[in-house]
Amino acid sequence: ALAYFFGRELYKKLNVPIGLVYSAWGGTPCESWVSFETAKAVGGFESTLNMYEECNFDRDAILARDPGAEHFQKPTLEYNAMIYPLRIMPIAGAIWYQGENNVGNNVQYEPLFKGLINNWREIWGNNFPFYFVQLAGYQQPVEVQPGSQWAALRWAQQKALELDNTGMATAVDVGETDDIHPKNKQEVARRLSLLALKNTYGFTDIIDKAPELKSYSFTNRKAVLTFSAPLTVKEVALPRGFIMQTPTGQFVKGRCTLENDSTISVSGTFTGAPISVRYNWADFPNGNLYGENDLPVLPFRTDQMDGVLNSIETVKTDSNDKTVDVVTTDGVVVRRNADHSSATSGLPEGVYIVGSKKVLVK
């Protein structure tokens, strides 16, 4: 359905027949769609890949006798059968909607998914556009859920945007609590088509992205977040979907105020500056920030964002002083005038700048 609706949206604008090569198998993990070499380079699949090499001699006899109940979920299977044979066909690009079967393996997913994109481009000999869908919300809503595996997988997907000629359409706001495959495929396809129409087919007037976090600053109990374009708050009067990490490492719900059309302040009932802020970080998040073209602001976490400016206050770094300031690596002052001997005592695990030195807290 998604591929059909995507093609239909392109046809409305291009007014020419759209060719779609549908190569998909439900319930498969990302590693099923990459080459042996890519899976081996990413790591984590050694036992299966070694078995492949050992069984190659007797492969036909083994498969005829018992292919295995979950053979379609094995590394490289769909790649070998459903992707590699297509490499002789010229294509304009690829769209991808997958990830549910990799939830829980979020750290591995980032290099795996990037490897897939590079792998496919290599065998086609073409740096074609690769547009993909960020997973929809799923399961029962939880207001403060920093350990969400679904949110972590979405973040791993988002990291693929670091590759050239990629784009992501989020489905985070069209999910259903009890259906891992939500029915609103038309909206997801529309968002994918906006990416293709603007970046592949040259419709430069199309808005294909929501506002992005441009800068932030942390002060006592408060974060101020500035976005790249005006925001629209839907459903209720105030922004929602934010959680804050307190100086003790605990996460709490953030109370939000819209300062102007592109700036939000988030506050909490704790003492000190927050360590980080996350937006739409849950299995089934309820964030309500949108931009033009009804596109939702993507989930984010300030503690893992490159290229976003943060306000760094004047920090005491002189190691000869009796006290020092303690700062996170993304510039948040978490302690002022702390004694050298106990500067990081009680802080969450991570790397901090204590005075003029980096310190690892375990």
Language model: regions and residue ranges:
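C-terminal outer-membrane/trafficking sorting elements
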Residues: 309-362
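Cell-envelope and extracellular/periplasmic
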Residues: 1-308
